[in-house]
Curated annotation (Swiss-Prot):
This is UPF0235 protein MmarC6_1603. It comes from Methanococcus maripaludis (strain C6 / ATCC BAA-1332). InterPro entries: DUF167 (IPR003746), YggU-like_sf (IPR036591). NCBIfam families: DUF167 family protein. One of its GO terms (cellular component) is cytoplasm. SUPFAM superfamilies: YggU-like (SSF69786). Belongs to the UPF0235 family.
Length: 101
C-alpha cells in the first residue's frame, strides 16, 4: 500500500497525505487504505496557512529535506513534494514513522 502513496515524478517524490488539524501533537498516523493517503496530525488550525506551514516544518524534520505542498493547499487532502530523496529513502523513513506498519 505504501508504494501506491509514494510516487516518483520529474521533480522528485510525491506523497499523498490526509491532514487533521487541531491535534494534540504533530505526528504521522496510519495509512488510510480507502483514500490511499498517509494520515498526518497537526496542532495548528487551518487559518491563514498556519497548518500548511506546520506540515512543511514537521515533515522537513522527519525527512531532513526540503518539502513543498504540490497540491491541495486549501484541502485536507494534499500531495507533498520531496525533491532530493529517492523513493526507497522515503518509503524507509515512512515505515519507521507510520503507526500501523
Amino acid at each position: 500500500m505504501i508504494k501506491e502513496i509514494v510516487k516518483e515524478s520529474e521533480k522528485g517524490i510525491l506523497i499523498d497525505i490526509e491532514v487533521t488539524t487541531n491535534a494534540k501533537k504533530n505526528e504521522i498516523g496510519k495509512i488510510n487504505e480507502w483514500r490511499k493517503r498517509i494520515e498526518i496530525r497537526i496542532k495548528e488550525q487551518p487559518i491563514e496557512g498556519k497548518a500548511n506551514k506546520a506540515i512543511i516544518k514537521f515533515l522537513k524534520g522527519i525527512f531532513k529535506s526540503e518539502i513543498s505542498i504540490n497540491s491541495g493547499t486549501t484541502s485536507s487532502q494534499k500531495t507533498v513534494l520531496i525533491p532530493d530523496k529517492t523513493k526507497e529513502d522515503v518509503v524507509k523513513i515512512l515505515k519507521k514513522e507510520i503507526k500501523s506498519i
